[in-house]
């Protein structure tokens, strides 16, 4: 039986998905399963790692049954994952010693405060490209070792293993034969030196993380190990590609050249720009991260995250009940010529890059007696585009590269009003692909390269198909006036703390 399909596993924050991709890069079938969110205290978010694993087994079985494709026809497995979420488990039993601590969780704030107090910010920045923040995996591992009896001692003896979700899934799929991660995920731990490409002894000492528990770091596209037959309908299938979700989306968007960038409009926005084989240190509060490692070399990216994007549209729907469904926001926004001076600063959980202000809160400016819900909805959508421009401007400043086009994906990229305004406020065209499942595609392409389904990046590029290109329609003067108004609104919101 010909092995011509790739199985891509997308382990996300609220659900796990499995997709089967054919040689043309088309999605043949998909299965999805949600799992529970655990909130032990305000600001804490955890997952049951065994439940995540069960959801992965369920979606693998589900997608094979749904498509009537045999496990014998699967050439390889690619994995993409929610980044930074951390699991520590017992090497012998395979049981986690505590829940997985999720990327959103703020429970390690005290550890971060201590690191800042001890003066580690510059060291961390210069070695990892990251900021000290509870977002990243290293402090989560430290928290688990601190809060589970005997964990530190057991970790030092080599009895416990640490991993982000990719590592956990590969370990389970291969029956414990492979304890690995890839460059993209390792670069999100606060423990990995992105220049020397190794776990950094000084950083490990700083957080007192025993080296014995860390996974081996491997390229993003490589045959790592085979699945154990009992997890895969009697087949040993190569696990052959891994990338964190945002890097996978950059790859799935075909952003292979230096200076190419993508924005994923999900709950938040994640912007990544490929900076090639050179790591660009940011002077503007962006993260420097590993994009992927392929063909014996690594490539880097600049990353900026916007905390509130799609969730602002959900707020219009669920909080304010201004729209029945998220897609209605496009119709309301398009009915009027402008927002009439209304600005929404959706800083519900602070502002991310390039402001990094966790104390600022949401605000609305410019309301008059004539303001109606159309202006309010339009201004909320526009805020996503303004924040994207903030980040892209910072990327251009840091990298010295002028953006020529922006590729987009994620739920809100389906909103034509938003995409047109995005193009207008950036002053560059915006390209939306036919297949918006770019994260899953990225994982599939990485695995397919390793097992020979695709020859090289050039062949993969041909599978990127344009759905719509949004050309710039706004005049320069209007663009700058609107953007200046946005900056005034942000400053005013920051002053209100």
Swiss-Prot record:
EC number(s) stated in the UniProt entry for this protein: 2.7.1.30
Disulfide bonds: none
Protein name: Glycerol kinase
Binding site for glycerol: 83-84, 135, 245-246
Keyword Disulfide bond in record: no
Subunit structure: Homotetramer and homodimer (in equilibrium).
GO terms, molecular function: ATP binding; glycerol kinase activity
CDD domains (alphabetical): FGGY_EcGK_like
The organism's taxonomic lineage, starting at the top: Bacteria, Bacillati, Bacillota, Bacilli, Bacillales
Organism the protein comes from: Listeria monocytogenes serotype 4b (strain CLIP80459)
